[in-house]
């Protein structure tokens, strides 16, 4: 008996010790599962709180804790990094899914025996095995949808890669440059934490080492890189903004030389203005885009650290506005006086981006060769999966579409439904949503199909809401009654969705709470469910309904029916040689000025001066800003701003500033250089291919975003380049890269004058780097040369509108 009593006492002591040690372990390692779930709910944006059950977040926290316990680096990750960069499910504005579990099961054995840095590289190889780059629309696919599709734009690739890294317990975050300074467009990539330090990598674009990607050079010319960190984060980085849901931090110091500008805002008497909004704007896509927005403190001050280039400061308070160009690295203290004057009627501004800087990490030839071998193998795995897809537009979602077409009774309207939703919808839409949109009506009119039949309202994740609303709102017989229902029942929360995530329409109905965008999506979704044509106006973002041949704006505050008070604007432009038909977002944009702030009019990407503005376009009455810009090969931009007021018929002169400088010889390249011709498999000289005269030489990389962009930009000018008639020689650096390239994707879109080949032993690349004094081997590189060995144009790295830049040079030759 004594022995039994002794054993019982010992067991109690052991259990007590286990409990105490468990508590100490939890204190050292972090918090309990419920504490992490509570942390998520404390800072969770409203749509995530309403659209997903608590069990979803509990499961994902369990998976995070499992990865922490099972991965060899789990105990080395500090609590701050684990809490903010592993536990959160959301990366960007994607639809949340169960990728953490799927990815962990696929990756855990692949990375278990590796160091943390090697594990990051290995995860990126896995990502490349499944996903490559291809542009798409603004809605961000979920990680599992991207996996199913096998491609995505950079925002989707980086969301996918961050999700994969977090699944195995590696802290990771998506880094975004909201806009490049030296060219149009933006970019997103990944930072991952290992052994006490953050490293960057190109998502789904594996390199042999960390801190290396095609964007190194572009990033060195960047002016702002940021990331939104879930919750109240207290790391060492500069804080740009704190909201109820996230902390936005500035990480530009990791990529480029920086400087700080301190801003003081004063009133007419020179007294500091508290609470003035100061927007830091970067020229991109033919507008001054706000990359940072700050409020002045009690002393009227704020600041920003950025790359050493030009921005436009735009300060507003109570309708008063002041703008001023600043140069980071030159200007240190800037005072903006809100003196009651509005924007100047017209002004010319020259914007200069930062220069190239920075050094690339060392990569041995052996490392590069092994990485190329692995990438070729990974390409083959992905292509084998893609070969199973019978319909390109449906990608990996083809079984869902086939099921729908087999089950639907109204075949004609089923085909119309598939034609009015986006291509991205076809790739990830669920069977439930398709069946929810079945109709017994046969109406193929544009109004019905686009604004009643289609479930797509904006950039929201599609859900099966129509049958739900027909049941719940069956008492509503007029669209005016639906507006009244929204007015009386839906409250607006302006604080708990700062990212403007799209709240599901059924959640809005259940919660009776959302933000302005959520209310608009809800209204349109409910209206279509009840048979009322409705939309969100793609230009000004206002919700509208269609009645009696007229579109009416929805006003949740007023009872009366209001059609838009429209006037006609005509842009008077005299075409010049290089810009016979300026393009929206490339050469010009229009913004409406509301309380001193510029609100961009979001016309379709294909909008042009001749097609949309030459003969007049209807706009609401008010004050507007016309921005035009001419971007030079150096990245510098010649900007013109024109402010005007619309009332009745209004004509505004449209000005494109020109750079009339003739092409100059800037270097040399031996036209007798040999390359391996892709078609003949023979070595040939450039001269023997091009004949005497000018030609274009491009050194490109397979399946990389900068090259893909460049080739697509060139394709826009296919006809003009064929009329020019000169050859364009496009070379890969080696045969491995040439074999990895998807010729089928580009051959039909490029000019017939294109010749493909491989640089023999890298001789041409070496000469280009030396002769053009290029500091890095970033690709692509495009040159305009002649066979007398003269180079008159050179552009390296990531750029937008390359085709236009080449044509400008060609027309001057």
Which residues fall in each region the model found?
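Secondary-structure boundary elements
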Residues: 29-149, 185, 369-371, 375-511
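Short, acidic Ser/Thr/Gly-rich low-complexity loop/linker segments typical of extracellular
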Residues: 284-305, 595-613
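Hydrophobic/aromatic-rich core segments of domains that either
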Residues: 105, 109-115, 119-125, 134-144, ...
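Short active-site neighborhood of thiol/selenol oxidoreductases, capturing the structured segment around
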Residues: 686-710, 714, 727-731
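Short Pro-Gly-centered beta-turn/loop motif in secreted/extracellular proteins
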Residues: 301-312, 317-320, 326-329, 607-634, ...
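Short, internal strand/loop/helix patches
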Residues: 744-779
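Short, ordered, surface-exposed loop/turn motifs in non-cytosolic proteins
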Residues: 268-287, 308-309, 576-604
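A short, hydrophobic beta-strand/beta-hairpin element that forms part of a small beta-sheet core
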Residues: 778-796
């Amino acid at each position: 008996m004594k022995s039994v009593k002794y054993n019982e006492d010992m067991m109690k002591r052991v259990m007590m010790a286990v409990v105490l040690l468990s508590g100490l372990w939890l204190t050292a390692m972090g918090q309990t599962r419920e504490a992490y779930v509570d942390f998520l709910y404390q800072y969770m944006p409203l749509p995530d709180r309403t659209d997903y059950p608590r069990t979803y977040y509990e499961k994902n926290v369990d998976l995070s804790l499992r990865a922490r316990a099972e991965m060899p680096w789990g105990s080395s990750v500090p609590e701050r990094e684990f809490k903010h960069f592993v536990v959160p499910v959301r990366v960007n504005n994607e639809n949340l899914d169960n990728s953490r579990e799927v990815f962990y099961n696929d990756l855990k054995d692949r990375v278990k025996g590796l160091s943390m840095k090697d594990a990051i590289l290995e995860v990126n190889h896995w990502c490349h095995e499944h996903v490559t780059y291809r542009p798409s629309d603004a809605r961000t696919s979920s990680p599992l949808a991207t996996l199913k599709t096998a491609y995505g734009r950079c925002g989707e690739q980086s969301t996918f890669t961050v999700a994969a890294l977090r699944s195995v317990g590696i802290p990771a975050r998506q880094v975004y440059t909201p806009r490049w300074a030296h060219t149009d467009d933006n970019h997103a990539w990944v930072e991952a934490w290992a052994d006490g330090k953050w490293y960057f990598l190109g998502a789904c674009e594996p390199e042999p080492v960390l801190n290396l990607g095609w964007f190194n050079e572009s990033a060195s010319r960047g002016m702002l890189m940021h990331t939104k960190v879930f919750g109240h984060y207290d790391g060492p980085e500069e804080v740009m903004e704190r909201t109820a849901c996230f902390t936005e931090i500035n990480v530009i110091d990791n990529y480029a030389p920086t400087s700080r500008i301190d801003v003081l805002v004063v009133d007419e008497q020179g007294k500091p203005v508290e609470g003035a909004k100061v927007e830091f704007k970067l020229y991109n896509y033919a507008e001054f885009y706000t990359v940072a927005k700050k409020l002045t403190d009690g002393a009227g001050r704020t600041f920003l650290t950025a790359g050493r280039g030009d921005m436009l400061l735009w300060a507003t308070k109570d309708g008063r506005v002041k703008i001023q160009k600043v140069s980071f690295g030159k200007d240190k203290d800037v005072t903006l006086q809100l003196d009651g004057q509005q924007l100047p009627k017209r002004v010319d501004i020259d914007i200069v981006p930062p220069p190239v800087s920075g050094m690339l990490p060392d990569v041995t030839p052996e490392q590069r060769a092994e990485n190329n071998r692995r990438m070729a193998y990974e390409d083959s795995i992905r292509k084998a999966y893609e070969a199973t897809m019978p319909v390109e537009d449906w990608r990996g979602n083809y079984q869902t579409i086939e099921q729908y077409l087999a089950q639907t009774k109204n075949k004609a309207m089923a085909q119309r439904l598939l034609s009015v939703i986006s291509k991205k919808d076809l790739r990830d839409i669920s069977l439930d949503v398709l069946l929810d949109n079945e109709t017994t009506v046969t109406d193929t009119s544009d109004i019905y199909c686009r604004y009643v039949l289609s479930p797509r309202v904006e950039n929201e994740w599609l859900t099966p809401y129509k049958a739900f609303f027909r049941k719940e709102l069956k008492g509503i017989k007029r669209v005016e009654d639906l507006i009244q229902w929204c007015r009386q029942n839906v409250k607006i929360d302006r604080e708990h969705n700062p990212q403007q995530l799209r709240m599901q329409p059924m959640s809005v109905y259940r919660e009776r709470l959302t933000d302005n965008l959520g209310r608009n999506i809800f209204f349109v979704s409910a209206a279509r469910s009840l048979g009322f044509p409705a939309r969100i106006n793609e230009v000004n973002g206002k919700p509208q309904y269609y009645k009696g041949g007229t579109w009416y704006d929805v006003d949740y505050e007023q009872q009366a029916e209001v059609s838009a008070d429209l006037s006609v604007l005509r842009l008077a432009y005299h075409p010049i040689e290089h810009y016979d038909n300026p393009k929206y977002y490339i050469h010009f944009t229009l913004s409406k000025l509301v309380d001193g702030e510029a609100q961009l009019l979001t016309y379709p990407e294909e909008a042009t001066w001749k097609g949309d503005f030459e003969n007049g376009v209807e706009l609401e009455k008010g004050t507007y800003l016309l921005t035009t810009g001419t971007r030079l090969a150096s990245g510098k931009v010649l900007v013109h701003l024109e402010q005007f007021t619309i009332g009745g018929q209004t004509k505004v002169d449209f000005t494109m500033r020109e750079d009339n400088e003739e092409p100059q010889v800037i270097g040399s390249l031996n036209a007798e250089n040999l390359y391996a011709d892709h078609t003949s498999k023979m070595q040939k000289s450039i001269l023997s291919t091009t004949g005497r005269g000018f030609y274009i030489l491009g050194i490109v990389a397979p399946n990389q975003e900068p090259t893909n962009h460049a080739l697509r930009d060139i394709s826009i000018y296919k006809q003009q380049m064929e009329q020019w008639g000169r050859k364009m020689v496009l070379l890969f650096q080696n045969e491995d890269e040439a074999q990895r390239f998807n010729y089928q994707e580009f051959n039909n879109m490029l000019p017939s004058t294109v010749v493909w080949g491989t640089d023999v032993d890298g001789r041409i690349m070496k000469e280009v780097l030396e002769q053009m004094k290029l500091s890095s081997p970033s690709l692509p590189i495009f040159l305009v040369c002649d066979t007398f060995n003269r180079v008159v144009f050179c552009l390296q790295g990531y750029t937008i509108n390359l085709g236009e830049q080449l044509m400008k040079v060609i027309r001057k030759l």
